[in-house]
Amino acid sequence: GPEGSTVLGKGHRTILTVLAQYPEGVDESQIAILTGYKATTRYQTLKELRARGFAKRDGERWAPTEEGLHELGDYEQLPSGRALLDYWLHRLPRGEKKIFELVVNSYPEAVSKRDLEEQSGYKATTTYQTLKELRARKLVTIDRGQARAAEGLFDA
């Protein structure tokens, strides 16, 4: 129904929502970052979703099935283009937001991790972890130590 089904627990809804928001599929490291769930919880929940026919796995990637989307009902869809950029700028934790803004402001140029460390004042490990989180959200691409804002963020 419109409110989603009672069959789904909170964890199932949360993970299924992430799958629905990224229809091209997400891997387990992305699911970890996007949900904050520990490995055992993720594993168990994905296993149950797949057993019920609500999620499918293709190689490393997980995606919702038609049944899964139907079961989920209404969920918050991610906007696209500039609206997605604004969406995340209002929702990212402070550390991620700071790094994200630096990467966005230098677009279309890429920024080196070293420059991001210097400009943000964060340690290398923090900068690296933050970039991994931004990449999981599909907000940045990372290539040879250079981070670039995702192209789609600048579409009208």
Predicted regions and their residues:
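Short amphipathic alpha-helical elements of helix-turn-helix/winged-helix folds
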Residues: 14-22, 58, 71, 98-106, ...
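Short alpha-helical segments that sit at the start of domains
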Residues: 1-16, 73-101
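Short acidic, hydrophobic short linear motifs in intrinsically disordered regions
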Residues: 23-35, 107-120
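A composition-biased, non-transmembrane "mature-region" signal
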Residues: 5, 34, 90-91, 122, ...
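Accessory beta->alpha helical hairpin/"wing" motif in late/C-terminal subdomains of nucleic-acid enzymes
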Residues: 58-78, 143-156
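Long, compositionally biased intrinsically disordered regions
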Residues: 1-39, 43, 48-54
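Short amphipathic alpha-helical interaction segments
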Residues: 36-52, 56-60, 121-137, 141-144
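Short, low-complexity cationic-aromatic patches
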Residues: 7-10, 21-24, 38-43, 91-94, ...
